Amino acid sequence: MIAGSKLLMLGLFGALAVHALPEPAKAQVTAAPKLEERATSCTFSGSAGASSASKSKTACATIVLSAVAVPSGTTLDLTGLNDGTTVIFEGETTFGYKEWSGPLVSVSGTDITVKGASGATLNGDGSRWWDGKGSNGGKTKPKFFYAHKMFSSTISDIHIVNSPVQVFSINGATDLTLSGITVDNRDGDTDEGGHNTDAFDVGSSTGITITGATVYNQDDCLAVNSGTDITFTGGLCSGGHGLSIGSVGGRSNNDVANVIIENSQIQDSTNGVRIKTVYEATGSVKNVTYKDITLSGITKYGIVIEQDYENGSPTGTPTDGVPITDLTLDGVKGTVASSGTNVYILCAEGACSDWTWDGVSVSGGKTSSACENVPSSASC
């Protein structure tokens, strides 16, 4: 009997325990929202737009810059954006005047999309700084657009007018594509106008693609100073110094490799195809291809390759510290003014090798008698 009572009491206790204790609460787990749900689309405009955008940039999945007036001496700072951020320029973006080095705009981040809406312009109003000296003296002029440390990103349909000096600085970037970019500095085509208005300066970057660019300027359309796996295709370059490698040497990174420049036109420019390396510097230029390049209205050199640059000017004495190897020119054709030179090659002994030239035809100018150490496959 006692044993039976014990069993009955245990059974009742167990039943009470089951009913007395509540079920454990289920963990409240909220799925991470998608980026477009986590952040908002933010629009900034007017004179306070630049500051507000810079302060709020990490809270917005899409940043719309509508007719922003960037104050003088101020960078439109879009560095450190959240992954996947989209930046859209609308209307006319303007910049206040001050003598300073810039940049006027700076963007960095991963999986970033920067684009211009239809009709949008970034107006540097460079005439306020222009004095014909560029970055070599006179007024201190701000560089325009830093695309530094941009990874797996795109910049498209940006229309830049009248940059004070250099336009795009691409540095420390990987897998960056720029498409449909327009740089229009034609207002600077005067003696006291724009100078050193390079459109695209590339350094220490990998996997850079520039496609469909239209450039009117007074310096290099493209200048690759260092980097690998760089492509420039479908471009129109007018009024400047051509499509250039270099100058290579004298920087922290002095190696250029795997560059393709193709299907592009160079017109009304000082030079067409240009490669320049620095006197007594070290580095390398290898596996560079110029393919299907059309030249017209070239005033100085149709093709110029020199290993003698010092302080931005040729010395006439080439050195071998930056060899140029595996260079291909395929289908480079066009005309040079009668006062210009068709082809000029100045290599140090043994420093230019493994070149392939096919379908190269540049005429109208003079034949140089000052070429040195020209590889057998090329002609000067």
Swiss-Prot record:
<keyword id="KW-0732">Signal</keyword>
<dbReference type="GO" id="GO:0071555">
    <property type="term" value="P:cell wall organization"/>
</dbReference>
<protein>
    <recommendedName>
        <fullName>Polygalacturonase 2</fullName>
        <ecNumber>3.2.1.15</ecNumber>
    </recommendedName>
</protein>
<keyword id="KW-0378">Hydrolase</keyword>
<dbReference type="InterPro" id="IPR050434">
    <property type="entry name" value="Glycosyl_hydrlase_28"/>
</dbReference>
<keyword id="KW-0326">Glycosidase</keyword>
<comment type="similarity">
    <text>Belongs to the glycosyl hydrolase 28 family.</text>
</comment>
<feature type="repeat" description="PbH1 1">
    <location>
        <begin position="173"/>
        <end position="204"/>
    </location>
</feature>
<feature type="active site">
    <location>
        <position position="241"/>
    </location>
</feature>
<dbReference type="InterPro" id="IPR006626">
    <property type="entry name" value="PbH1"/>
</dbReference>
<dbReference type="InterPro" id="IPR012334">
    <property type="entry name" value="Pectin_lyas_fold"/>
</dbReference>
<feature type="repeat" description="PbH1 3">
    <location>
        <begin position="256"/>
        <end position="277"/>
    </location>
</feature>
<feature type="propeptide">
    <location>
        <begin position="21"/>
        <end position="38"/>
    </location>
</feature>
<keyword id="KW-1015">Disulfide bond</keyword>
<keyword id="KW-0677">Repeat</keyword>
<dbReference type="GO" id="GO:0045490">
    <property type="term" value="P:pectin catabolic process"/>
</dbReference>
<feature type="disulfide bond">
    <location>
        <begin position="347"/>
        <end position="352"/>
    </location>
</feature>
<feature type="signal peptide">
    <location>
        <begin position="1"/>
        <end position="20"/>
    </location>
</feature>
<feature type="disulfide bond">
    <location>
        <begin position="371"/>
        <end position="380"/>
    </location>
</feature>
<feature type="disulfide bond">
    <location>
        <begin position="221"/>
        <end position="237"/>
    </location>
</feature>
<feature type="repeat" description="PbH1 5">
    <location>
        <begin position="319"/>
        <end position="364"/>
    </location>
</feature>
<dbReference type="GO" id="GO:0004650">
    <property type="term" value="F:polygalacturonase activity"/>
</dbReference>
<dbReference type="InterPro" id="IPR000743">
    <property type="entry name" value="Glyco_hydro_28"/>
</dbReference>
<keyword id="KW-0964">Secreted</keyword>
<feature type="active site" description="Proton donor">
    <location>
        <position position="219"/>
    </location>
</feature>
<keyword id="KW-0325">Glycoprotein</keyword>
<keyword id="KW-0961">Cell wall biogenesis/degradation</keyword>
<feature type="glycosylation site" description="N-linked (GlcNAc...) asparagine">
    <location>
        <position position="287"/>
    </location>
</feature>
<dbReference type="Pfam" id="PF00295">
    <property type="entry name" value="Glyco_hydro_28"/>
</dbReference>
<feature type="repeat" description="PbH1 4">
    <location>
        <begin position="285"/>
        <end position="307"/>
    </location>
</feature>
<feature type="disulfide bond">
    <location>
        <begin position="42"/>
        <end position="60"/>
    </location>
</feature>
<dbReference type="InterPro" id="IPR011050">
    <property type="entry name" value="Pectin_lyase_fold/virulence"/>
</dbReference>
<dbReference type="GO" id="GO:0005576">
    <property type="term" value="C:extracellular region"/>
</dbReference>
<feature type="repeat" description="PbH1 2">
    <location>
        <begin position="205"/>
        <end position="226"/>
    </location>
</feature>
